[in-house]
Swiss-Prot record:
Domain spans labelled LDL-receptor class A: 25-65, 66-106, 107-145, 146-186, 196-234, 235-273, 275-314
Signal peptide region: 1-21
Originating gene: Ldlr
Primary location recorded for the protein, binned into one broad class: membrane
Cystine connections: C34-C52, C46-C63, C68-C82, C75-C95, C89-C104, C109-C121, C116-C134, C128-C143, C148-C160, C155-C173, C167-C184, C198-C210, C205-C223, C217-C232, C237-C249, C244-C262, C256-C271, C277-C290, C285-C303, C297-C314, C319-C330, C326-C339, C341-C353, C359-C369, C365-C378, C380-C393, C667-C682, C678-C697, C699-C712
Alphabetic keyword roster: Cell membrane, Cholesterol metabolism, Coated pit, Disulfide bond, EGF-like domain, Endocytosis, Endosome, Glycoprotein, Golgi apparatus, LDL, Lipid metabolism, Lipid transport, Lysosome, Membrane, Phosphoprotein, Receptor, Repeat, Signal, Steroid metabolism, Sterol metabolism, Transmembrane, Transmembrane helix, Transport, Ubl conjugation
Name recorded for this polypeptide: Low-density lipoprotein receptor
Modified residues (Phosphoserine): S735
Amino acid sequence: MSTADLMRRWVIALLLAAAGVAAEDSCSRNEFQCRDGKCIASKWVCDGSPECPDGSDESPETCMSVTCQSNQFSCGGRVSRCIPDSWRCDGQVDCENDSDEQGCPPKTCSQDDFRCQDGKCISPQFVCDGDRDCLDGSDEAHCQATTCGPAHFRCNSSICIPSLWACDGDVDCVDGSDEWPQNCQGRDTASKGVSSPCSSLEFHCGSSECIHRSWVCDGEADCKDKSDEEHCAVATCRPDEFQCADGSCIHGSRQCDREHDCKDMSDELGCVNVTQCDGPNKFKCHSGECISLDKVCDSARDCQDWSDEPIKECKTNECLDNNGGCSHICKDLKIGSECLCPSGFRLVDLHRCEDIDECQEPDTCSQLCVNLEGSYKCECQAGFHMDPHTRVCKAVGSIGYLLFTNRHEVRKMTLDRSEYTSLLPNLKNVVALDTEVTNNRIYWSDLSQKKIYSALMDQAPNLSYDTIISEDLHAPDGLAVDWIHRNIYWTDSVPGSVSVADTKGVKRRTLFQEAGSRPRAIVVDPVHGFMYWTDWGTPAKIKKGGLNGVDIHSLVTENIQWPNGITLDLSSGRLYWVDSKLHSISSIDVNGGNRKTILEDENRLAHPFSLAIYEDKVYWTDVINEAIFSANRLTGSDVNLVAENLLSPEDIVLFHKVTQPRGVNWCETTALLPNGGCQYLCLPAPQIGPHSPKFTCACPDGMLLAKDMRSCLTEVDTVLTTQGTSAVRPVVTASATRPPKHSEDLSAPSTPRQPVDTPGLSTVASVTVSHQVQGDMAGRGNEEQPHGMRFLSIFFPIALVALLVLGAVLLWRNWRLKNINSINFDNPVYQKTTEDELHICRSQDGYTYPSRQMVSLEDDVA
């Protein structure tokens, strides 16, 4: 090979290598190339958090060239950032330079609203009503004495209520004066009472609540009027117990154990338990003393055992030898060395650093978390945008608002308090509510009326209400709406049940009922087919189950006493609940793991009742404080007062389109008949795995699913029929197409069945049931045949199959013999026997051998 050819090959190799390097350095269309050649996602450029090692993705030169879209606002300034237009002048600073809240026109109230001195707007109904609805109290500043109309009753506190509510056995005035004997003129109000009495294991508060009897005289008020702590003996601790500063008792072994067991933390005060020297500038001698770090290796003995003056270590820098054995950073100490790790890494085996997966920790990000080497990245779900100033995910679009119950009404308040009105006035005792955002509809339950209602939100003030459920309700404390499949779910604490119905209230079914259960609040996840509810029975718990009533189990059973409200943050996949006994807000993931206590506060969580999640905030109602509070849902910090001077605020929900994401209604989009082919209810099934059914059929109470898994039969009929036809579960998967195996009871009497007319069922469905009943009756008739006939019906098919197999074998043998070259002998005996054996007769049952004859040699010889 010549020198020129060799040089030419070297040039080609170098060009190919350069092209490969260039190809590796180039980034894809959706990526941004840092100055050092690293590629990052384009959406991370100029988001306020540097991802490039050299910081070039957040440099002023890069970000100043960013052009905002038409529906965005440019923050401008040194580093231009883009935010949604809807965040402009919303009362919250989103730009670093506050430019999104500068030059905003003053907010004006509508002609029908009252403007508070702080600029907020409230409904004129709230002015001079005895409650401070403006945070500055300006709505009650210049009010005259309250006068009630002729159709109203004046409470002792000057509040006006409808006359029909007075002396009805249900306390409506804050002071209870509407039920005082002197105001009722001796009328019997006990017979009119609508509140359910407490059980024998519960204590009836003077304020009408029911609490566990074990909570009476426990040193903590649980009743709203604190009647559970009246006339209690002074508590004294046993000799083996420690008395906390608040008077409560704990076991003596829990004092000074480095854990706070007393609520006031007094069990860890004044403890002397030194196991190491305090502060980084202290050195612990091997002999136990603590000396200043400056005295180490100063050629003077300060430790009794001279451990502060080791001759070899004091003059040696261990980091010079193989970096001290450290994988990243080595820090030389006066005695020895120490391995350190950069930010985003942790030290393992004292020498090696490994990346920390921050995304494994709950609530690292408000929504999505992307783990990177040495760091992590927070992202937002669809419908949200990362706030460049606060680094939290904010909803895009119109501002959200709170809907909450206020005893006799449902109120509506925007999050910036620019609007505060009464949405549903003149209610009796509303306790639970939920919404259907797409249809702009609200649902609520009334504890006194024992009914569930519904109304369009833009028509609600006109008293245009629809009664959804009006029968068989006792205490509907919890309510949730499946906005995808158009169903409602509610709890009833008296029978201890969870039920479901369509949003029209035509079809309903009880999904869960358990003695001793006291279900309270409920929340649904129709995207994945699950429901969750709190239960303050004995023992208290949080339960989870499918929206069709299957796979019900407990998620939380420990460190829980009085769980009230519960809510689900779909974006982060976490459940939040309040505990009125523990005065806390806690959260777990939807599988019951990664539990976290968000906030504990006996003052602002005196008696929390319900809560709602939106963006980075948690909102909750408190019936003792008669107020609504908010806090950071990740840290529990930044607690603020949202509304006060309310009348028994209980349920609260957040109304915004991002709280109810879209999903697929498989009951309407399948290839089956409408309603999934179900005769009655079509309920979503829990999506436990990739092969889980999408929905199941369900029947009303007192009826069971038939063998086709879609139509319904009365439970009475199934008892009269055979065990086989009645052993069908009331809720089954829609993917099942074969009826279950069943046994036959020969001794069961033959009883005719009639088609069942069920409310809400069509004529076609009734015909289906009748046809199936006839089929069952035909099957029943066969059971009465003699045992001999049954034996023949089983034996004959088996014999026929055996004959067919035998004939096939003979045909194969015949074919094989015909294709074999054989030698014929003249021996007549041999010839006769072989001819007989090869002679095959064909009968109507197939090929069979003829009866074999016995031939004697003596006969032939003769």
